[in-house]
Amino acid sequence: MSWAHTPTLTQYLIEERRRYPQASGDFNALILDMARACKAIARQVAYGALAKSNHAVTTTINVQGEEQKPLDVISNECFMRLTEWGGYLAAMASEEMDEPYLIPEQYPRGRYLLLFDPLDGSSNIDVNVSVGSIFSVLRAPEGKTEITVDDFLQPGTQQVAAGYAIYGPTTMLVLTVGRGVVGFTLDPDFGEFMLTHPNIRIPESTKEFAINTSNARFWEPPVKRYVDECLKGKTGPRGKDFNMRWVASLVAETHRILSRGGVFLYPRDNKEPKKPGRLRLLYECNPIGMIVEQAGGRASTGYGPVLEVQPTELHQRIGFVFGSREEVERIEQYHNDPDASPVDLPLFAERTLFRDETL
């Protein structure tokens, strides 16, 4: 296929920069270096089992209490080493690191902060399911001599850019700089990200939802109600049939919803009281939330906009619901106004496999 008239990521960023003549170019350089990191990670992921002999990394436990696979460590190093040197970052924070990483003194200090999940869904690698990388860019505070954790604790509304790479049948980079959402496909022959999806939009309505029903007994009543209504299909209060999906890869779930609509729920529950949510606010929910909102969807905690949440911890977890606007707003309504349009609440009442007799 000829790419003669298809913009590259570099060309796209140059065109965006022309809208702001005062811009220094640091922002473009940061995005391009993150794209380089994603290319490097894509190559490592593509080797699959063939790379096991090269991944002689001892298994460790990260700050989240989760087992780090060798590719988690390698991907984290890719992001750090390919972005620390350029002079546009003041510090970075990763899901895989306990504390922020301050840019070494031998490199110029920049104006931005980078947060990232270097390899989301890495537990799926062994079964060859799509995985990805997620990133968020914030402005560093001016006039401070040293960056601290508090400087990263900015609500999602303060993000300058957000994006993810998905490593699947093709490698794609999905990006927002606050002017809609665009998607780039990696051309394996030329090694360039090419603009293939210039205006990604999420349909307002959907007949598809994604949730892990094995956690049903831990859900709050509004979530149980929503899922019950979906499962009742045409004979229920929604008057239409729904399909259910669950990939256990946030990037893969997001990409499907951006491609054809849907709603994703990883809600707050009582499975582990110390972890009322599962997904990380700063590394996952905020960047995905910005992308979804810029694509015309809605991103929520279940109660209200996730991008307006004021973070309190670097590795804070939170309930997360996002996707087609109509469905997310319905879920918010069920949380905030439980008496609206009452329906039968018992979840899966005719499906004894999931029925919770304590409800």
From Swiss-Prot:
Identification of the protein by name: Fructose-1,6-bisphosphatase class 1
TM ranges: none
Protein family: Belongs to the FBPase class 1 family.
Residues engaged in binding substrate: 120-123, 212
DNA repair keyword on record: no
GO process terms (BP): fructose 1,6-bisphosphate metabolic process; fructose 6-phosphate metabolic process; fructose metabolic process; gluconeogenesis; sucrose biosynthetic process
Cofactor(s) essential for the protein: Mg(2+)
Cofactor descriptive note: Binds 2 magnesium ions per subunit.
Top-level taxon in the UniProt lineage: Bacteria
GO MF, one example: fructose 1,6-bisphosphate 1-phosphatase activity
InterPro entries: FBPase_C_dom (IPR044015), FBPase_class-1 (IPR000146), FBPase_N (IPR033391), FBPtase (IPR028343), Fructose_bisphosphatase_AS (IPR020548)
Binding site for Mg(2+) 2: 117, 120, 284
Record gene name: fbp
Keyword Disulfide bond: no
Ligand binding (Mg(2+) 1): 95, 117, 119
EC main group: hydrolase
E.C. no: 3.1.3.11
Keyword terms: Carbohydrate metabolism, Cytoplasm, Hydrolase, Magnesium, Metal-binding
GO CC list: cytosol
One Pfam family matching this protein: FBPase_C
Cell compartment(s), UniProt: Cytoplasm
Location (main, coarse): cytoplasm
Catalytic activity: beta-D-fructose 1,6-bisphosphate + H2O = beta-D-fructose 6-phosphate + phosphate
Pathway it works in: Carbohydrate biosynthesis; gluconeogenesis
